[in-house]
Amino acid sequence: MSKHNVQYNLSLVGVNANGISSKLKSLDHIISNLKPSLICLQETKVKRGGRIKVESKDYVTFELVRKESGGGGLATMVKADLSPVWISEGDDTTEVLVVEIHIEGKNIRVINAYGPQLCDNNERKIKFWSRIQEEITEAQDNDISIIFQMDGNLHAGREIIKNDPNNSKTNGKYLEELL
């Protein structure tokens, strides 16, 4: 047994970027000051993959770019020493990006997602939340831990978030069912 008990401290930054291209300097600032283990970005709004470039070479970047429509998009950036691997991704309607990391022999799935808008039809919402449930179930069936970070466009309501000023809407109700 080693005389040093070393533990890995995992830190996560998650944010709706509302367009990352003009904010890369801010992203570099976050990376250099906070040194997060994981960064989950929603609504990157890049038109092609490979546009999210940062000064640090310590990160592996996984992206989901919308193919048919503008907006949206996801990026999950992971420190390379966590041995990240791509697991799965959704599409323009189910914006989900799943990456697996490894810490001290433990597998952890990072689910990064961007939920449907309040005005989207119910079919799209059901498809999205079903996909989230599938990803969670698959991880659980394989005894893999989960980190779930998203912009769910929720309006979660007070039942989920104490003092939420919004009344619960459809996405909030779907999240409540998921929990």
Residue ranges: model-predicted function:
Residues 1-179:
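A shared catalytic/ligand-binding motif for oxyanion handling
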